[in-house]
Amino acid sequence: MNTTPDMPTPRALRELTPLEARILGVLVEKQHTVPDTYPLSLNALTAGCNQKTARSPVMNVSEDEVTTALDSLKHLSLVMEGSSSRVPRFEHNMNRVLGIPSQAIALLTILLLRGPQTAAELRLNSARLHGFADISSVEAFLDELAARAQPLVIRLPRAPGARENRWMHLMCGEVNVADFAGPDTGGGTDSVPPSEFEALKAEQKRLADEVARLNALVQRMATELGIDVDAPGDVS
């Protein structure tokens, strides 16, 4: 689904470091979400790399580390430094170097910033970068990225109980897909996503605490009224 047939011929690239990949993701993201401050200063770029939300994994890098990574990205022509400002500012050049359209850049950016995602998650999380009409259009661009001579993404095996496959970027090199498959539990039912499972555990604890509080209140009131009340779990 290449909607821009005149895209430049893609170049072969070396594997990026996690920080280099994070920098590219931040530059594309901020280009769309805060265009008034783009290209980014070193300070803004570092803050974006260390951002706590919409990042996986969360990083804590210094400006010196970002500067070193920027130098490497400039040698690869993936990043350009502007000269029209007193403060150095940086912008990405991914479209031209990778030879892919903006729709694919949007999907790749989310994978760079957030880690493995399903097509549905990518459509949702990339909305501020590009509005995809449906999940099938997301998958079409992902399939193109995966079918390149130098693949940029890979479809991970569906984890046991999961309804959808996740996708992962390959900008930092090949991955062992078995690491992302998860253990085979042998069950035939759908599993609960980790976030929902944690929420259920928290709700269970809250309800248990509430029951304990109400039991204590009943016992206290019964004592004050001189009423004999069986303790919870007693069988008369």
UniProtKB/Swiss-Prot annotation:
InterPro entries: DUF480, WH-like_DNA-bd_sf, WH_DNA-bd_sf
Pfam families, A to Z: DUF480 (PF04337)
Family (UniProt): Belongs to the UPF0502 family.
Protein's recorded name: UPF0502 protein BamMC406_5439
